[in-house]
Design a protein with these regions (language model features):
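Membrane-interfacial loop-to-helix junctions in multi-pass transporters
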Residues: 26-42, 69-79, 148-155, 204-211, ...
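Core transmembrane alpha-helical segments of multi-pass membrane transporters/permeases
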Residues: 1-21, 34-38, 46, 198-231, ...
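Short amphipathic alpha-helical coupling elements at transmembrane boundaries
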Residues: 22-32, 67, 101-105, 112-116, ...
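Hydrophobic transmembrane alpha-helices of multi-pass small-molecule transporters
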Residues: 1-5, 117-213
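Alpha-helical transmembrane segments and, especially, the helix-loop junctions at the ends
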Residues: 44-60, 76-107, 126-133, 258-271, ...
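Hydrophobic alpha-helical transmembrane segments of multi-pass integral membrane proteins
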Residues: 2-11, 32-64, 85, 237-277, ...
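Conserved small/polar residues in nucleotide/adenosyl-binding loops
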Residues: 333
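Transmembrane alpha-helix boundary signature
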Residues: 11-26, 52-55, 76, 191
């Protein structure tokens, strides 16, 4: 909830003082129109791999993606889908991602070994996705107008990206972004002190529905877990395994269901990891393989559920419905 509040305050403050427009102008002056979507996807992949958090990546890139969409005529939901897809790809492979840590610890394998197996599965899909985004962007010409690049207004986003890549806590990154955006806005005349406060208040208000949905979904799912519903389904999923392929399918189904119920892939991995380890040992599945399956399917499901933090965050920052973003995620997933 605190991350949602801070993200809303930062996004609106940065927008009010011109940081989003300045960053969009910078991106559009570097990349041709047909490569903008693919460029945002690659940036999201790189940032997420570097920082190990998909939510932090979405917070940093979603406003820029929406700004690019507005100037080029591409749907906002499409560009937000690009950001979410890249963020989940990087989260899946990052060495410092909590999902990678939990998956490898529960399966008893080394992170480097899991990465080698994981990337063989994920990289071809990422390449195809990047090519798909180039194809989607082929209809975007160079007829749009770009304003002058105001470097001082780009500074807050650069600081947010650099500090995130350096591994600084997401909340600290957002607080720094809010303060720096406010200072730049005051110096450049973007707003006065009351305008800064009003921007933060508006950003937090815009996140209100998102916060309520998150709290309600979390409470409902915890009630299901507390009453044994998740354990019962897991038992049913694992009771009829007959082959190695069936065991791998059960591991994938197990983590997918746990993620659907918890809307948190780390918690889902903690719950399903020990059971997946038992299945892998019984059917002699390589720990690197089982860890990769757990991490891949946890990130896959987390990235497409409309009540997950990633889609809710992207939807809140872009002022669209999570369902609108999902129709573009289907192209990737």
């Amino acid at each position: 909830v605190l991350i949602f509040i801070l993200a809303g305050a930062f996004a609106q403050t940065a927008k009010a003082m011109g940081a989003v427009d300045a960053t969009v102008n910078l991106a559009m002056s570097i990349l041709p129109g047909n490569l903008l979507a693919a460029g945002i996807f690659l940036a999201a992949c790189f940032i997420s791999i570097s920082v190990g958090t998909s939510v932090g990546t979405i917070v940093a890139l979603a406003p820029v993606a929406v700004g690019i969409a507005d100037k080029t005529g591409m749907p906002d939901a499409l560009m937000l889908g690009v950001v979410v897809s890249g963020a989940m790809f990087g989260d899946n492979l990052s060495f410092i991602s909590d999902t990678t840590i939990v998956a490898t610890r529960t399966q008893g394998c080394n992170m480097n070994d899991k990465f080698k197996v994981n990337i063989r599965i994920a990289l071809p899909i990422a390449i195809l996705t990047g090519l798909l985004y180039v194809l989607i962007g082929s209809g975007v010409g160079s007829g749009y107008e770009t304003g002058p690049i105001e470097w001082i207004k780009v500074l807050p986003y650069l600081v947010v990206l650099v500090t995130a890549i350096c591994g600084v806590n997401v909340m600290m990154v957002l607080i720094a972004g809010i303060i720096l955006s406010g200072i730049v806005g005051l110096l450049t005349g973007g707003f006065d002190i009351w305008g800064w406060n009003a921007s933060m208040g508006l950003g937090i208000t815009n996140m209100g529905e998102l916060i309520i949905v998150t709290l309600l979904a979390g409470g409902m799912l915890e009630m299901i877990r507390y009453n044994g519903g998740i354990d019962w389904i897991i038992l049913k999923l694992t009771s009829r395994i007959r082959s190695t392929k069936g065991a791998e399918g059960s591991i994938a189904a197990l983590i997918s269901f746990a993620n659907l119920c918890t809307a948190n892939n780390t918690i889902a991995l903690i719950m399903a990891g020990p059971i997946a380890k038992d299945i892998a040992d019984r059917f002699k599945i390589d720990p690197r393989r089982s860890a990769s399956l757990l991490d891949i399917f946890s990130c896959f499901v987390q990235g497409i559920i409309p009540y997950g933090a990633q889609l809710l965050m992207a939807a809140g920052l872009g002022h669209v419905s999570p369902i609108e973003i999902m129709q573009y995620l289907s192209l990737i997933h």
